[in-house]
UniProtKB/Swiss-Prot annotation:
UniProt-listed PANTHER family: METHYLTHIORIBULOSE-1-PHOSPHATE DEHYDRATASE
Species for this entry: Trichoplax adhaerens (Trichoplax reptans)
Cofactor: Zn(2+)
Organismal lineage: Eukaryota, Metazoa, Placozoa, Uniplacotomia, Trichoplacea
Name of the molecule in the record: Probable methylthioribulose-1-phosphate dehydratase
Keywords tagged on the record: Amino-acid biosynthesis, Cytoplasm, Lyase, Metal-binding, Methionine biosynthesis, Zinc
Amino acid sequence: MQNVQQPKKRKLSDEIIAEDEDYQRDPEHPRNLIPEICRLLYSQEAMTGSGGAISMRRNDKIYVAPSGVQKERLQPEDMFVINDDGDTLKLPLNGKICRMSQCTPLFLTIYRLRGSECVIHSHSKRAVLATIISSGNEFRISDLQMIKGIYKRTENRNYRFGEEVVIPIIENTPTDPELQENLVKAMENYPDTCCVLIRRHGLYIWGTTWQQAKLMYECYEYLFDIAIQLKQLGMN
């Protein structure tokens, strides 16, 4: 009887390699999008001095920008690939020596609590100033057209003109992982929010798609800028 050779079962590493090869043909692969958006935010002075990071989910894999690198020079090959448990599936390609972002535990927490597909962390000057001019643990703003670009999670719709957007502010800590406990509390206490501000540090923003996260980031930045200028003018 002739032996029938069984096809070889693909290993997880083979699947990762096959999927990663797609980035050379797919401009919306996380390996391409993360460097592109990092360069954009660098040009807006939100990711200078190696600060900030972006993470995106693609199927069951999570792509994370490395830490301590010049964000405007990131390349597709520089990304870490991890799973939902934080296990490293793939290191940066071409033998590059990079460090996993300190934001990774917070990215994983946001994915777990919100089911997001993209998380942006930046050291935006507008976000920092917004936390300084806000005396309490919240940033509040209303009656501006750009509020309509912010997603209201519990009602599965965007905010309407005239509604008030409330963003929680948590206190900064010596390291990013130490922010996790207060980040979780803020997300639980403010179920509508897609943003958490960190006093004198920056912000985390997330969305169900990378497009939503990026658009909301831009809307939040606009709202922070208006609030800062109103404060300078002595207006509410």
